[in-house]
Amino acid sequence: MSQLPEIIRTIDRVSADVVAKAATFQAAILSDVAGRRGTMHGRVAPVHQNMKVAGPAFTVEVRPGDNVMIHAAIALAQPGDVLVIDGKGDQTAALMGTLMLSACKKRGLAGVIVDAAIRDKLEILELDFPVFSAGFNPAGPTKYVPGRINHPISAGGATVNPGDLVVGDADGVVVIEREKAPAMMALADKKVADEAARIESIARGDTAAKWLPAALRAAGVLKEGETL
């Protein structure tokens, strides 16, 4: 049985420099260079497509439909943190709404990611604060079931450890392990440059994917010597 407390107050966070650099990349770029791992299920999406978030994960695990631990997490999280909540994908009640999210913004959090329903969509759109969720439900939550703060969680099918790098945009959310995040930044720079060069070649009329014939042969679709 774990001897760790249910609430862990002190965590190691991905550095501010890495967060600032990561914020310049699309989530898709970071997902590619991280080996196409760590992306959350598409159900976890921004309330508005223009919302973006980047920062260290401050993790919360709750029982479906109960938000007492989220209130505790808001009180403990530091400016720049991204609240990442494992709500088990539950859609039967909203875990957060305008009041709690306004408190998150006031405390300087970078954003909130909830693998569960939230509510007050129209007000959130006016809040100018990045929020990602698995859906919406007008029903409110209960506030008495214990949970955990800053333990490893699963949100949207992705493993999230406290302090990991979290980046979200219109495409969804990607999580990169804190220890690996710095090395991913140079790879992301190269990926962006490579894609820009490819877009330029497409604009010149070179639309052929050079790798495709070999891939089709390896898959057994094309015979040796056969071309498209």
Where do the model's predicted regions map?
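C-terminal binding/interaction regions
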Residues: 166
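Histidine- and aromatic-rich ligand-binding microenvironments
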Residues: 169
